[in-house]
């Protein structure tokens, strides 16, 4: 991807306490409606209010179908500096590498993050009062076992 792209935010929200309590080795899927469209996307993941490092074991973005379901063929794996996994220090933010994905204005998107290890009760997710992230009981994006 070209380094001279001009990025514009299309969706944001405030951190809010997770209502699911502690969990481990789960995929967290967040859905959102993009206000603007485009043909290239990247994702900003914040650990700005975190008290410990946040490990990302895998991530993807896709066009959302209905509920937590995604539109087949639209899923794009995300990388961070060319790597499939990343650790975000407490108080830091991380941007994914850009990926090609055609997003129409007002399109619904789904971002999935595989969070390996133990996630404590004080974990905060982004969301609005009635916009709840889905926590999968399966490791949808977990690394393959060799």
Segment roles from a protein language model:
Residues 1-146:
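N-terminal secretory targeting modules
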């Amino acid at each position: 991807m070209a380094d001279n792209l001009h990025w514009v935010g299309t969706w944001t929200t405030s951190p809010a306490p997770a209502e699911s309590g502690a969990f481990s080795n789960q995929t967290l899927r967040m859905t959102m409606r993009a206000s603007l469209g485009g043909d290239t996307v990247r994702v900003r993941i914040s650990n700005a209010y975190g008290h410990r490092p946040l490990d990302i074991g895998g991530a993807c973005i896709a066009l959302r179908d209905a509920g937590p379901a995604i539109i087949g063929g639209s899923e794009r794996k995300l990388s961070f500096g060319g790597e499939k996994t990343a650790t975000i220090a407490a108080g830091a933010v991380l941007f994914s590498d850009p990926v090609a994905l055609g997003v129409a204005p007002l399109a619904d998107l789904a971002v999935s993050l595989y969070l390996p290890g133990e996630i404590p009760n004080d974990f905060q997710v982004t969301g609005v009062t009635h916009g709840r992230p889905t926590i999968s009981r399966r490791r949808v994006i977990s690394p393959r076992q060799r």
